[in-house]
C-alpha cells in the first residue's frame, strides 16, 4: 500500500515513520520537539509528529497506538488510549501523551513515542429491526460466558 505523507517540519526527513523489523505491524512515530518536554505524573500533553498523512481510501483508517515499552517501563501511554485517523483527515498527526506513572518523564526531541497501524475499515449500514433472531448468548454480557 502506498500512502501520501506530508512532511510539515523539515527536520522530520531524517526521522520518517518506519517499521522496526520485517514483522512489525506498526510504523514508529517520533516526537517533533524543539527541546525536551517533562511530563509530570498525571500530566497529559499533545505532542506533534511534524507529519501528516492522507489515506484517501475509505476502506482504510490508521490507529495511533502506544509503544509497549514506554507504557510498561515508564507509564507513558496515550491520553485518548487510541488515536483514530480517518481516511479523509489531512492534518498533522498529534500524539496525546499521558504520564500515568509515579515519576516525571522526559520526552526528548525525535524520540519514538507511538506507533501507527493501518487497518481495513468496513462502513456498516443499519437494518432497523423490532427483534433479533435469538442467539446462544442473547443479552448476556460482562462476564456472562464464565471465567474458564
Swiss-Prot record:
The keyword Kinase belongs to this UniProt entry's keyword annotation: no
Record-linked Pfam families: dUTPase (PF00692)
Stored InterPro entries: dUTPase (IPR008181), dUTPase-like (IPR029054), dUTPase-like_sf (IPR036157), dUTPase_trimeric (IPR033704)
Main enzyme class: hydrolase
Domain of life: Bacteria
Keyword Magnesium (UniProt): yes
UniProt record similarity statement: Belongs to the dUTPase family.
GO BP term, example: dUMP biosynthetic process
Main function: This enzyme is involved in nucleotide metabolism: it produces dUMP, the immediate precursor of thymidine nucleotides and it decreases the intracellular concentration of dUTP so that uracil cannot be incorporated into DNA.
Name this polypeptide is given: Deoxyuridine 5'-triphosphate nucleotidohydrolase
Gene: dut
Cofactors: Mg(2+)
Binding-site list for substrate: 67-69, 80, 84-86, 94
Pathway the protein acts in: Pyrimidine metabolism; dUMP biosynthesis; dUMP from dCTP (dUTP route): step 2/2
SUPFAM superfamilies, per database record: dUTPase-like
Catalytic activity entry: dUTP + H2O = dUMP + diphosphate + H(+)
UniProt entry keywords in alphabetical sequence: Hydrolase, Magnesium, Metal-binding, Nucleotide metabolism
Amino acid at each position: 500500500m502506498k500512502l501520501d505523507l506530508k512532511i510539515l517540519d523539515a527536520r522530520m526527513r531524517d526521522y520518517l515513520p518506519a517499521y522496526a523489523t520485517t514483522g512489525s505491524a506498526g510504523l514508529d512515530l517520533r516526537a517533533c520537539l524543539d527541546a525536551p518536554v517533562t511530563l509530570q505524573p498525571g500530566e497529559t500533553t499533545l505532542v506533534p509528529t511534524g507529519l501528516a498523512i492522507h489515506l484517501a481510501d475509505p476502506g482504510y483508517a490508521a490507529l495511533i497506538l502506544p509503544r509497549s515499552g514506554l507504557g510498561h517501563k515508564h507509564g507513558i501511554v496515550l491520553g485518548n488510549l487510541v488515536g483514530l485517523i480517518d481516511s479523509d483527515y489531512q492534518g498533522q498527526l498529534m500524539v496525546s501523551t499521558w504520564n500515568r506513572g509515579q515519576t516525571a518523564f522526559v520526552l526528548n526531541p525525535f524520540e519514538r513515542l507511538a506507533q501507527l497501524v493501518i487497518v481495513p475499515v468496513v462502513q456498516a449500514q443499519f437494518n432497523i429491526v423490532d427483534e433479533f433472531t435469538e442467539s446462544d448468548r442473547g443479552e448476556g454480557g460482562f462476564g456472562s460466558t464464565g471465567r474458564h
